[in-house]
Design a protein with these regions (language model features):
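Primarily short, surface-exposed interaction patches in extracytoplasmic proteins
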Residues: 28, 64, 71-342
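Sequence context surrounding c-type heme c attachment/ligation sites in exported
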Residues: 1-77
């Protein structure tokens, strides 16, 4: 469910989960489309795998940082062992009716133990950061775990192997209410609007995702290029040409400059879907380089109170990374070298 909805919002600017239990109330997204896209990922398992360092990353810095964290973990492990020994000793010293608490610690030691456990967890998380990982598709063996008290559904074809021969629509989103079968696919409305070839997706394991990826970046797809351009525009101007970058549906906002959105989408595809080139085009444009001060502020405030005409550059809220880099830059502590500790 999460993968289907994330793909829908990121590349198609549609919240797919709205069509999980019923046809979308505001957009032409039937339930069949939702389960068709979900069928693309029905044979997919995600896992964390170790990845190699990038060429520009500083392995030496990562090694030093990992060593520092390991030394902290060792120190806390030692403190924890000392506390455990103290607990054993105090348990042996119980006399009369005055018993030691359940854990054998006084309030001060309890606070120390809590601090040690919290720091151990924090440093182990920090240690994970220095190990490059990637979220990839798991292709190993699947261990099936079952709840012995749960409801048992006998498979229709017990010896079917490799991949599901069919996926179904769950009526009302209930996994126990199986409805019509559905084939892997994309959004039918996008195919009809863009004149795309509505070829059925292959059923083979691994081929479904490739088919969806090709469908998403098809030049006839009326959504993807516009969605990506609108999203990148919003990074630089604080808002997109079409409002919410994740909502191109009926509840979203109409584009303020539809011709510009179409032009940039066409330019984006003709330039190999290069985000770097699109960033360069936007950042070197007269629109982006305009001052936030207009020579006639009263007139522009009356004619364009929301700044939708881009007669001046409206200040936008900085993200955390930009604030961090700005503070390091003005203090002279920014390291311009690529790679190293994040």
């Amino acid at each position: 469910d999460d993968v289907t909805d994330s793909v829908g919002q990121a590349f198609l600017a549609h919240a797919m989960q709205c069509a999980k239990c019923h046809d979308h109330k505001f957009d032409p997204v039937p339930t069949r489309d939702y389960y068709g896209m979900m069928a693309v990922f029905s044979t997919t398992q995600l896992a964390e795998r170790k990845a190699s360092f990038l060429p520009e990353e500083s392995k030496e810095d990562f090694g030093l940082f990992a060593g520092l964290i390991q030394s902290k973990i060792a120190s806390y492990d030692k403190q924890n062992a000392e506390l455990n020994e103290k607990i054993k000793r105090l348990k042996k010293e119980e006399k009369g009716n005055a018993k030691v608490g359940d854990n054998g610690l006084d309030p001060g030691d309890e606070a120390s133990q809590s601090r040690i456990f919290k720091n151990l967890i924090r440093h182990k998380i920090e240690l994970d950061r220095v190990q490059p990982l990637t979220h990839a598709v798991y292709t190993g063996k699947t261990i099936v775990r079952q709840n012995v008290r749960g409801r048992i559904d006998m498979p229709e074809k017990p010896w079917q192997k490799g991949y599901y021969d069919s996926d179904v629509i769950y009526s009302g989103g209930d996994v126990y209410s199986k409805g019509d079968t559905v084939e892997p696919g994309g959004l039918s409305a996008a195919e009809s609007l863009g004149g795309m070839n509505a070829n059925p997706f292959p059923k083979g394991q691994g081929k479904r995702r490739l088919a969806l990826a090709k469908w998403i970046v098809d030049e006839k797809n009326p959504l993807t290029a516009r969605v990506m351009v609108n999203r990148i525009w919003s990074w630089h101007f604080g808002r997109g040409l079409a409002g919410n970058p994740n909502n191109f549906g009926g509840t979203g906002e109409l584009p303020t400059h539809p011709a510009l959105l179409d032009y940039l989408a066409d330019w984006f595809m003709k330039n190999g879907w290069s985000v770097k080139k699109l960033n360069h085009l936007i950042l070197t444009s007269e629109t982006y380089r305009r001052s936030s001060r207009h020579p006639d502020p009263e007139s522009i405030s009356e004619k364009d109170p929301k700044g939708q005409l881009y007669a001046r550059f409206l200040p936008r809220r900085l993200v955390a990374e930009e604030i961090r880099d700005a503070m390091l830059r003005v203090s002279g502590e920014l390291n311009p070298r690529v790679g190293g500790i994040p």
